[in-house]
Amino acid sequence: MLKLLLLVLFMLLGAANAAPPRFAAVLPDERLEFPRDHGAHPDYRTEWWYATGWLSTPDGKPLGFQVTFFRAATEHDRANPSKFAPGQLVIAHAALSDPAEGRLLHDQKAARAGFGLAYAKTGDADVKLENWTFKRQADRAYRTRVEGAEFTLDLLMTPTQAIMAQGEQGFSKKGPHPAQASHYYSEPQMKVSGSVTRRGKPVAVTGTAWLDREWSSSYLDPEAQGWDWTGVNLDDGSALMAFRIRGKDGSVLWSHAALRDSTGRVTNYAADAIAFTPQRSWTSPRTSAAYPVQLAIRTGDIVWQLTPLQDDQELDSRASTGSVYWEGAVTVSRNGQPAGRGYLELTGYLKALKL
């Protein structure tokens, strides 16, 4: 915690004499290009590599996992040649959901990029924060390793399907104004193998993961409170992504959903065809935030029911990104029939999210 506080203090002191940089704008005519867009985009304000999934132990017990690396450009002048200038920050979160524990196990790190200790490289996915790593290998598989205080994840995630460009060929609107957008793509249905270590004992795991890649310079409307998002790997090989951005007045500022079937055909749903309906809430005993952990999401004539693996999947990241949110493994039914498993993210329920 002290290291993080010193880092923030150093940034604020330096910013007093720094010329504010001009961040790159998200433009609708810019197309995704690979492997370039697997890597970092340092000219944009915010970016993340976000992997979630379900794992199974040899005795069949389910686990949920989340590994996220963030890159954030600061207000410091990027033309400053000093190696000590904190122009980029790297932040990481990791979490493990296990009903046997009854709570979310999680950890976090943050550091300014530089000196080989923290970086987010351009050209392909290669992100490091001390001994936490996320890298795309020559065979297209992603390898991530994080060593938390209560657990270690060492996972290999291998794509089995084509990249799913979200929105309009990767241009994803997040509000009515042109600047409120991101470049966004997903890699659903990834095959996972590796190990989870707790209390010094590694256990082999297999499973299925979802990777989200997103970068932006102006993500949220000033009146936004937070968002609800889900990414679901469906049992028939399909993939569902849906989100809504909630206003501070309780309204829905923006929403979008996309369903890609097993043949690769994508159906995009506009706001008038989408509805998020809370079914049950859980109140955190630590923060008193109430989260709608059980949701029904309607996309067109389909109703998806999301049920949490466990209620307590609250992640307190105030020591790194400053936010508290709920992010957890969920089972999913389609019109009342079991259909798949995924992750649900609920932000802005303690206080408005700033991004």
Language model features: what each stretch is:
Residues 19-355:
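Structured soluble/peripheral alpha/beta segments that form catalytic or ligand/cofactor-binding pockets
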